Structures are given as structure tokens and as C-alpha cells.
A protein has these predicted regions:
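Nucleotidyltransferase catalytic core that binds NTPs
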Residues: 1-145
């Protein structure tokens, strides 16, 4: 097999692998990591995510509080529980208001081309109600622009 055929085969295999990736992102603090977080990761995988990226706050979390557990240990817990990549949310966003926290995390997620899904948990579990609330918030944001 000549070089161009080897290159074509490698390119073809790479494209096939990339098109089969269905990566999901989770915005997290894992402060501390608990069974509910593990369940969320398991459910994200069960819903078809082939890869999971967690955007996680570092040693300081929302409200400028120090994290209960070191960021490296929290990242390791996430990796052992099924997350494939942990990306640290920079301090200015990690310690900001909920809106800025989320906005910073989403900006990071949008910079990762393979991520197609945002996986999140909720206390209500009512997807329709959450979707309607998101629509209202989106409409208000558009009107303000």
C-alpha cells in the first residue's frame, strides 16, 4: 500500500470515528462529588453519549467559597465515575453569579467541536416545564438586545 492509500485509509477511519462521537458536556462543581453526580454521569452515558466532558470549578466555587475538596481529587472522582475529560472553569466565572458561571461554562463547551449535548440534572425532572422556562428566558434576552 503506497503512502497516499495509507493516508486515505487513515483519514477515512478518522472521519468514521469522529462522526460516531456523540459527546455531552456537564457543567459542574462536584463540591463534594456524591452519588447523585455519579447517577447523572451514568444517565448521560445511558442516553447515548459516547464521551462526557465536565466543565468544573477549581479550588474556589460560586459565592467565592473555597471548595470542600481539592479540584484534583474532585476531577479524579469524576474521571473514575465515567467522565472522559475535565476542564477547569476559570476563577472569574467559577466564583461569579449563577448566570455568569453558566455563561462562562457554555463558552468553553461551545469551543469544543465534538460536544453536541448539554446534560444537566434538575430537582423537578419535568423536561416540558424546563423547556418552557428556557423559551421564556430566551425570548426575554432577545427582546433586551
Amino acid at each position: 500500500m503506497n503512502i497516499s492509500n495509507q493516508y486515505a485509509k487513515l483519514l477515512s477511519e478518522s472521519v468514521r470515528r469522529w462522526t460516531s462521537i456523540k459527546a455531552a458536556a456537564i457543567i459542574s462543581e462536584y463540591n463534594p462529588f456524591h452519588n447523585g453526580h455519579k447517577y447523572h454521569i451514568e444517565q448521560t452515558r445511558a442516553k447515548g453519549a459516547t464521551h462526557i466532558v465536565a466543565v468544573m470549578s477549581g479550588n474556589y466555587v460560586q459565592r467565592c467559597e473555597p471548595a470542600h475538596i481539592d479540584k484534583r481529587l474532585r476531577a479524579k472522582m469524576a474521571l473514575v465515575s465515567g467522565v472522559d475529560l475535565v476542564v477547569e472553569l476559570p476563577l472569574p466565572w467559577a466564583t461569579a453569579s449563577a448566570e455568569r458561571f453558566a455563561k462562562g461554562a457554555v463558552q468553553i463547551i461551545n469551543a469544543i467541536p465534538a460536544v453536541e449535548l448539554l446534560s444537566f440534572g434538575s430537582e423537578s425532572g419535568d423536561v416540558e416545564r424546563l423547556s418552557k422556562a428556557a423559551d421564556v428566558l430566551f425570548d426575554e434576552e432577545v427582546e433586551q438586545e
